[in-house]
Amino acid sequence: MRYLTAGESHGPSLTAIIEGIPAGLTLHPADIDHELQRRQGGYGRGARMSIETDQVQISSGVRHGKTTGAPITLTVINKDHQKWLDVMAVGDIEETLKLKRRVKHPRPGHADLVGGIKYHFNDLRDALERSSARETTMRVAVGAVAKRILAELGVDMLHHILIFGGITITIPSKLSFRELQERALHSELSIVNPKQEEEIKTYIDKIKKEGDTIGGIIETIVQGVPAGLGSYVQWDKKLDAKLAQAVLSINAFKGVEFGVGFDMGFQKGSQVMDEITWTPTQGYGRQTNHLGGFEGGMTTGQLLVVKGVMKPIPTLYKPLMSVDIDSHEPYKATVERSDPTALPAAGVIMENVVATVLAKEILETFSSTTMSELQKAFSDYRAYVKQF
C-alpha cells in the first residue's frame, strides 16, 4: 500500500491516490466523510472550517460499494478557492495580480522562509500553500480507507488529549478501552474527563482574545493488533520507528513517545520492563504495558500506545517579528487565517495516520490480493500466536 497527496490550501481541490488496497473491501464515500467531519470539529476551530464542508469524491478503484484492487482516487473540493481565483491561477497573469496576497514576511515556526530559500520562491505563498495543514485533509481521507481495512480485521483505535496548552487532563482510573473511546468521542475537546471541559474552553477563549495559540500532547491507543507485526532484522523494518516517522510528518508535531515514553529516562529497568505472562485461554500477555505494546520494533499483542506532542500553531493574530525578504528590514510576520488551537483536529489526523501505517504493515505482512484472502490469513495468524 502506498499513497500520494496533492493540492494547495487555497487551490481548487485536494487529491490522494492510494495503491495496494485489496479487492472486495466495502467502501462508501460516507465512510471517509465521517472522518473528514471529525477533523473539522472540535472547540477552537476557526473561520476556514465554517467555509469548508469536506466531502470526498471517489473517481476510481471502487465500484458498487466495493474496492476493485485498482488505484483509488480521492478528491475533496476547496470551496474557499472561489475567493482566490487570481491568487491561485494556474496560467500566467498580470504582474499587478501576481502581487495580490504576495507573502514576503515569513512566519516564525512555519515553512515560509526555508521553503522559499530551498525552492527559489519570490512569493512565499508557494511554500505556504502546500505546507499548510489543509493537506492533512487527504491524510485523514487515506486513513479512513485504512480504518475500514482494520475494522474488518477486528482492530479498533481511539485518541484523546493528555495535555491541553499546559493543562494536564486527569484521567479517571480503570477506564476500559471502550469507555475511553466513548468519552473522547463525545467531547468537543477530545478529553476523557468532562469535569475539565469548561476550564479548558475558558482558557482557549482567553488565548484567542490574546491573539495567541496553544499546543499539547495527544495519545492514540490501538486495540486488536496481534504480536509480531514489524521486525528487528533491519532498522527500517521496526514498526514503532515507522509510526514515529509518520506521526512526526504531521504538521506541527515535534515529538513522539511510546508507552510511558520519556519517563523511562527517570526509572530503573525493573520498573519499566513488562513481565511476561501466559494463560491457556489468552496465550502470552504482559503484567503491564509500560513499553506501549512494542518490543524490538515489533508489536507484543498489548494495546499500542503512541503519544505525539503538537507545538502551538505558528500563525498568530498578534504576529511575531520577522524580516521583509525584499528589503531585509524588520517587519511583523504575515497573518493568515488561524485557530487558537487545533488539538482535537490533530488528534483525528494522528489517529488516521497511525491507522494508515498499521494497515500498510498488515498488507505487506499477509497475503492480501482480496479482503477474504487477507481476513483468512490474519485469522490464521491470530490462532497461531495464541497457541505458540
UniProtKB/Swiss-Prot annotation:
Transmembrane segments: none annotated. Reduced FMN (FMNH(2)). One of its GO terms (cellular component) is cytosol. InterPro entries: Chorismate_synth (IPR000453), Chorismate_synth_AroC_sf (IPR035904), Chorismate_synthase_CS (IPR020541). The keyword Electron transport does not apply. SUPFAM superfamilies: Chorismate synthase, AroC. Pfam families: Chorismate_synt (PF01264). It catalyses: 5-O-(1-carboxyvinyl)-3-phosphoshikimate = chorismate + phosphate. FMN binds at R130, S131, S132, N251, A252, G296, K311, P312, I313, P314, T315, R337. Pathway: Metabolic intermediate biosynthesis; chorismate biosynthesis; chorismate from D-erythrose 4-phosphate and phosphoenolpyruvate: step 7/7. Its cofactor is FMNH2. Keywords: Amino-acid biosynthesis, Aromatic amino acid biosynthesis, FAD, Flavoprotein, FMN, Lyase, NADP. The keyword Electron transport does not apply. Its EC number is 4.2.3.5. It comes from the Bacteria. GO terms for molecular function: chorismate synthase activity; FMN binding. This reaction introduces a second double bond into the aromatic ring system. Homotetramer. Belongs to the chorismate synthase family. This is Chorismate synthase. It comes from Streptococcus pyogenes serotype M2 (strain MGAS10270). The gene is aroC.
